[in-house]
Amino acid sequence: MSGMTEVSSLTGRLLVATPALADPNFERAVVLLLDHDEEGSLGVVLNRPTPVDVGDILEDWADLAGEPGVVFQGGPVSLDSALGVAVVPGGASGERAPLGWRRVHGAIGLVDLEAPPELLAPAVGALRIFAGYAGWGPGQLEDELTEGAWYVVESEPGDVSSPFPERLWREVLRRQRGDLAMVATYPDDPSLN
């Protein structure tokens, strides 16, 4: 697990649930942290697709949504709200950000879903729509990290748009070095092992 030298250093990173994390909202979850500071943390779960098509709730954005084209459950907070997260190729460089997109980390950013989709269409490489988000109050995430509930790892732009979100937990762990890569082989139900 990575150490934290400053509170803001986790924005843009992934929280990967450890096998010991028992909360059903976060079992084998991969959470992209969109904001992390002394006031708390906010992120979205990248590997919880729902059966709801993006076009059913945000018709104008459906054409930009990456496969599988469904809304993802971003977390247990504010399930009636939608968040858009998009990868803008070249967005990590110093280029001017497209209108309607705010950089979070590298090429990953938040989309203003009130903006006309055609403003972003030429720039967006991948878009995911999330219903709800994961939120932590001041110090709450740090406590969970101390308790060993999460691994903190670097994100990659492809994590946001993985076409196989059900594999993301294992894929993210496999690309880590050392013992952490072995966690990817942990069985779904250790009692059957």
UniProtKB/Swiss-Prot annotation:
Pfam families: DUF179. InterPro entries: AlgH-like (IPR003774). GO terms for cellular component: cytosol. Gene3D superfamilies: VC0467-like (3.40.1740.10). Belongs to the UPF0301 (AlgH) family. This is UPF0301 protein SCO2948.
